[in-house]
Design a protein with these regions (language model features):
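Short beta-strand segments
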Residues: 125, 177, 264-266, 276, ...
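Acyltransferase donor/substrate-recognition loop-hinge adjacent to the catalytic core
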Residues: 3-6, 152-237
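Flexible loop/turn segments at secondary-structure boundaries
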Residues: 17, 80-83, 132-134, 183-185, ...
Length: 380
């Protein structure tokens, strides 16, 4: 099939948007490793009156049709705030799904590139569901198990289609898994050398570690935001999160938080590092069928009582404390809490391929790569 036999149209109506949002059910039918997103949340994501993204950007969901049959979706997007701050003309694409037909993929990529080009963009990058932490990358390894939260499960041919279209690798990220092995004493599960590093660092630097106060989460949010933004300023494409952005993210996350999995490290009473791990919501969503029917919510409620996986998502520290072992301190505290809480295994992701320091520590903790994701880019 050639791309000329495929008609691509921009979503204009609520009916079309619902078709866009529910199309993945066709692509992943029978795939036990796919985690259906909540339909209500996906619809709200594209609601310009609700979604925070549209306060600083624009996006256009597209449908690919062949003989009036829906065969693919894509959504190019532009974050004007980020582009202005970084002096770039970058667009992203996300929500890419298609049948196993390169002609369909080509038509979708053509539509996304064309939409971005018309708006003055010179580069396309993705897949991202608009944000760098929203299902980034095509899965290129690890299709044999479900993803953890904020990560994607995609068809193996997607990456091949992107490369055939002319896209090149921009970055590769790894998801690590640390399993709880059967041992006589749980303390044996945390490598002794990592514990020694953490204990020595804690004494030498005078570090105290405290759990986050979830009863006063509103007071913790600005502290976490300051640490997050300051710690990541060295990254080339990093844009500090505004107070509104970070607050929205933190409040949305609050119902999922376990106080024993959120830590601040302090020196002389001043916060210098922050870490956060979450019970993996995907262990719930995988049973929910997108929340289409009342019984889907009952199944999710039941599954929520038996989450046995945590996902370590954030570990940041002030630049002047790099190399002092604070990462080991926070990792060890989280691992001990996970063991106390009875979690079966811990995900640590995503870790960039070039982030050798974090990868080394995770591997010392017993982590092994169980998923690989690749983000692509090309000139438009």
């Amino acid at each position: 099939m050639t791309s000329t036999e495929v008609r691509v149209t921009q979503v204009k109506t609520q009916r079309q948007l619902r078709q866009f949002v529910t199309f993945p059910w066709r692509i992943y039918r029978g795939d036990r490793n796919w985690v259906p997103p909540l339909i209500s949340r996906r619809l709200a994501f594209f609601d310009r009156s609700q979604s925070p993204f549209f306060q600083e950007g624009n996006a256009a969901p597209f449908l690919a049709l062949r003989d009036d049959e829906l065969v693919g979706t894509i959504a190019p997007a532009i974050n004007f705030r980020d582009n202005e701050q970084l002096g770039r003309k970058l667009g992203v694409f996300g929500f890419f799904e298609c049948v196993e037909d390169y002609g369909v993929a080509c038509a979708l990529f053509d539509a996304a590139c064309g939409w971005l080009r018309e708006r003055g963009m010179t580069l396309i990058r993705g897949p991202y569901n608009f944000g760098n932490s929203d299902d980034p990358g095509f899965l290129i390894g690890g299709e044999d198990c479900p993803p953890v939260m904020l990560e994607a499960h995609t068809k193996p041919y997607y990456a091949a289609f992107a490369e055939r279209y002319g896209m090149c690798k921009f970055v590769e990220d790894y998801a690590y898994r640390i399993d709880r092995r059967p041992v006589a004493n749980d303390a044996e599960l945390i490598p002794e050398r990592v514990v020694r590093v953490a204990e020595y660092a804690q004494k030498r630097a005078g570090v105290t570690v405290r759990q986050a106060h979830l009863d006063h989460w509103d007071d913790e949010i600005p502290i976490a935001r300051r640490l997050f933004n300051t710690a990541l300023t060295h990254l080339t494409d990093f844009i500090p999160l505004s107070e509104e952005q970070f607050r929205h993210m933190a409040l949305e996350m609050k119902p999922l938080l376990d106080p024993e999995l959120v830590y601040f490290a302090e020196v002389n009473g001043e916060p210098v590092a922050f870490s956060l791990a979450l019970p993996d919501l995907n262990r719930v969503l995988i049973h929910g069928n997108g929340g289409r029917y009342p019984w889907d919510w009952m199944r999710m409620w039941w599954a929520s009582r038996h989450i046995d996986v945590i996902s370590f998502k954030i570990m940041v520290m002030l630049p002047e404390y790099h190399g002092r072992g604070l990462d080991a301190i926070l990792y060890v505290n989280t691992a001990k809490a996970a063991l106390r809480r009875g979690y079966r295994w811990m995900d640590m992701s995503l870790v960039a391929e070039e982030n050798t320091q974090v990868r080394l520590l995770v591997e010392k903790m017993g982590g092994r790569i169980f998923k690989r994701y690749r983000v692509y880019e090309m000139a438009v």
